[in-house]
Regions:
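Membrane-interface micro-motifs in multi-pass membrane enzymes
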Residues: 35, 53, 57, 81, ...
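Membrane-interfacial interhelical loops
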Residues: 30-70, 117-130, 212-242
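Membrane-interface helix-boundary motifs at transmembrane edges
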Residues: 3-4, 93-106, 149-157, 190-201
């Protein structure tokens, strides 16, 4: 048994972890995939690529937006996240191993699991963007490769850090680059202590001041429109400006119920909406809108409307509000009632309410449909060509 654990323990642990991540996103939390996908619009164009790359962290943001578009199919979204978490876990293990230069026991993989579990907790926040784990993964990859290069070529490789640090800052953002710098600093200090690097390498802590200076220069010249804290910790990691991943803790049952309703309305799961409302219904106007829309679509509204919670005069059609969620069921209701211009107005307002200024594939589709119905074919064709 001990021989089996020693030989296959790490492989089994990694496989189980990947399976758990896949099942979590596919079976337990698919509504988050829908929410992420509907709040962005990836464009296959060189202009879009260079637009993303014009901001610090742009490469991580571009890769994340490319991957998130596949969340439209939940099984693909769950598979992408499982692969990303496995890459993060494997690189965490390799970075830990690079500090010791010795193979780790199977419990070394357990140690490497802790950052992955913390990352999963952070990703539970619906406003955390995929660019955050991608940036961290790229930072770990850079750390691992540079640690291996330092073992081979010694302190001379430190000059590569002088060039790599600003490049990483611009490609993956401030927070992930700080992770890279501190991990490299720990590696250099350990090697100096073991006598494997000359004592001059003790000057590597100056890299902290170096990165700070790079960020201040970029803040004062290229990124003047962003707050200093966002430049230092990451611009594209969190959808809400001036807030950062990891600030929210706990399980918000009502929020996840609303996210599930949003996914069900989008995919026309009317019977599921009614069934869930019979079990439990959050008492806000959003749920009244969704349930009443489901009842109308299944021709039960007149008979069963008052069997469910009704929020008041806004239970059927909600007024406009300044957020990127509340108006979706009303937009859908207007579309099905044939009130095309009202649906168009709500879709446009929803798109303008996305907090990080992105467009939405779901909303652009509805806007295009409304333009076609209104006979504005040139505008609709322009949207389709996006």
């Amino acid at each position: 048994m001990k021989k089996f654990i020693s030989r296959y323990g790490k492989m089994t642990l990694v496989a189980l972890f990947g399976l758990c991540i896949f099942l979590f996103w596919y079976c337990g939390y698919p509504q988050a995939l829908c929410y992420q996908e509907q709040n962005q619009l990836f464009l296959w164009s060189a202009d879009y690529f260079w637009h993303d790359l014009s901001v610090a962290g742009g490469l991580a943001d571009y890769i994340s937006e490319f991957l998130v578009q596949f969340y439209y199919i939940p099984v693909l979204g769950a598979a992408i996240l499982a692969f990303l978490f496995l890459a993060f876990l494997s690189l965490t293990y390799q970075v830990i191993r690079s500090y010791t230069a010795k193979p780790l026991k199977w419990y070394g993989m357990l140690m490497a699991l802790l950052p992955s579990i913390l990352l999963l907790e952070v990703m539970g926040d619906i406003e955390v963007l995929l660019s955050f784990p991608i940036a961290l993964t790229l930072a770990l990859l850079s750390t691992w490769l540079m640690n291996l290069a330092t073992r081979r070529w010694g302190a001379r490789i430190a000059w590569a850090d002088v060039l790599l640090t600003p490049v990483l800052f611009w490609l993956i953002g401030g927070g992930a680059t700080w992770l890279y710098v501190f991990l490299r600093l720990a590696f250099f200090l350990m090697q100096v202590k073991k006598g494997k690097l000359p004592s001059v390498a003790i000057a590597y802590p100056l890299s902290i001041l170096y990165l700070w200076a790079i960020q201040l220069i970029c803040y004062s010249t290229l990124l003047v429109q962003y707050p200093l804290m966002s430049v230092m910790t990451g611009i594209n990691y969190y959808r809400v400006p001036m807030q950062y991943p990891g600030q929210k803790w706990g399980y918000d049952k009502d929020l996840y119920a609303l996210l599930k309703l949003n996914e069900q309305v989008r995919n026309g799961k009317w019977e599921d909406i009614i069934h869930d409302a019979q079990e439990s219904q959050v008492q806000v106007f959003y749920t009244s809108n969704c349930v009443n829309l489901a009842l109308a679509q299944t021709r039960q509204l007149a008979d069963r409307m008052f069997s469910f919670y009704q929020s008041g005069e806004n239970a059927l059609l909600a007024p406009r509000s300044r957020d990127n969620m509340s108006m979706y069921p009303t937009m859908e209701a207007f579309w099905r009632l044939g009130l095309v211009n009202s649906s168009l107005r709500y879709a446009s307002d929803l798109q303008a309410s996305i907090l990080n200024g992105k467009m939405s594939g779901r909303l652009m589709k509805r806007i295009t449909e409304c333009q076609i119905v209104n006979g504005k074919y040139a505008v609709a064709r322009k949207n389709i060509d996006l």
